[in-house]
């Protein structure tokens, strides 16, 4: 129970700190941009792919296309195929991954709006990032048991974004799910 209790405390503190980082007007602007995008591309790696694919799944349920290329080669191909109708999300807790800058530069050349999500103080390329969403900086990247804090803060932000996007066209999205659920979910009740 000690581990469960410590994780509960960590999760509560991380979500609270991430909530306190949120800027309402920025969140509304980001949700609007994502809602209007023809395609949302998420660039990330390692454990953050789980968060990206969870967001992708939720967006698919309301008819929004999200692409999560898994490796550096496919990320670069996806960047090359992007245009101004795409919006890119960069998920990187530290903001220091070597793949970020080349992708940001090319997205900028292609006229793609960029939203980066990372720990407080990790926007190292503000000239290429349209919106930066801060998450709790409660994790030490080199001194940790696992990515508990960064994972829960990233998941929380992506869930907040999905909920905000859903709410923009709530009636339409509810209708889409209602009319599509039998095809999406083939379980029989």
Predicted regions and their residues:
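A short, charged, Gly/Pro-tolerant segment at domain boundaries
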Residues: 171-189
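Glycine-rich phosphate/diphosphate-binding loops that line cofactor/substrate pockets in enzymes
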Residues: 25-37
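Glycine-rich phosphate-binding loops that contact phosphosugars or nucleotide phosphates
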Residues: 35-156, 160-169
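HTH-adjacent hinge/linker in prokaryotic transcriptional regulators
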Residues: 1-25
């Amino acid at each position: 129970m000690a581990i469960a209790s410590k994780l509960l405390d960590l999760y509560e503190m991380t979500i609270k700190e991430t909530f306190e980082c949120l800027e309402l007007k920025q969140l509304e602007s980001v949700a609007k941009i994502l809602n209007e995008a023809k395609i949302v591309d998420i660039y990330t790696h390692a454990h953050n792919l789980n968060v990206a694919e969870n967001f992708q799944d939720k967006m698919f349920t309301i008819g929004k296309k999200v692409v999560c290329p898994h490796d550096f080669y496919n990320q670069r191909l996806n960047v090359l195929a992007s245009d101004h109708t795409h919006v890119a999300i960069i998920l990187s807790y530290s903001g220091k991954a070597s793949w970020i800058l080349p992708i940001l530069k090319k997205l900028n050349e292609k006229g793609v709006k960029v939203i980066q999500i990372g720990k407080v103080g990790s926007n190292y390329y503000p000239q290429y990032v349209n919106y930066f969403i801060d998450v709790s900086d409660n994790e030490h990247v080199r001194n940790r048991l696992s990515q508990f804090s960064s994972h829960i803060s990233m998941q929380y932000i992506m869930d907040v974004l999905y909920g905000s996007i859903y709410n923009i066209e709530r009636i339409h999205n509810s209708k889409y799910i209602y009319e599509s659920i039998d095809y999406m979910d083939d379980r029989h009740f």
